[in-house]
Amino acid sequence: MGKYLLAFAVIAAFGSLESLAQDASLQPPVYDCHRAVGKIRIDGRVGDKEWAGAVPCSDFRDIRGAGYAAPKYLTTMRMLWDDDNLYISAVLEEPDVKAQVKVRDDIVYHDNDFEVFLNPYGDSVLYYEYETNALGTVMDLLMDKPYSQGGTYIMTWDFPGLKSAVKVQGTLNRSNDTDKGWSVEIMIPFNALSRGGADPRTFKEWRANFSRVEWLTKPEENWVWSPTGVVDIHIPDKWGIIRFVD
């Protein structure tokens, strides 16, 4: 009987360690978003010197967290801010850059894409979503609350004053060569994120997440900054934290 109890104890301990590892993998990452030193030109060229002072975020991971393979391709994401705007850049490693969706607010994630989710008020309720593909086609929307709380997406909403641009390092929709990837720059005015007259700049910490949908297989791969533990990014209380610093 003793050896069976010992075996059970070992299995239970292993399960506990596995659970702890999963819990640790779901701890929200924190990004210190620094003030921009100079003017940022939104042209998709992330190598510009104005991004030199922005620290890259931690590596993207599988949306499910620990125990799943690391993303096949690297994503380097940075953020900056000034008095008026939030700036986001991403460099996406991609050996075969492809995109088909061309119409604004069509379903961009049917292509490989880059996605931004912002909850400026830190309440894990109302949030904003931005997506783009390598053609620079934008899909943006407002969620009044998460789907799990009966939320509805408002596709007719657009970011007022949004600017974004994409640059392909290679060739688009040509699979007989090898590309480096593509990059995106985004400018979101703070006043586009105001809610009920409240200024989002008064909140020093935001909830946020960033994602890549990658069609290496079916179903697709989902690579994110802050894993949620399941294949569902619409869980704001599992997102990472942006801290605004001077």
Q: Where are the language model's segments positioned?
A:
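Structural preference for beta-rich elements and adjacent junctions enriched in aromatics
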Residues: A21-D246
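Bacterial N-terminal signal peptides
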Residues: A7-S16
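Positively charged n-region of N-terminal signal peptides that target proteins for export
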Residues: M1-Y4
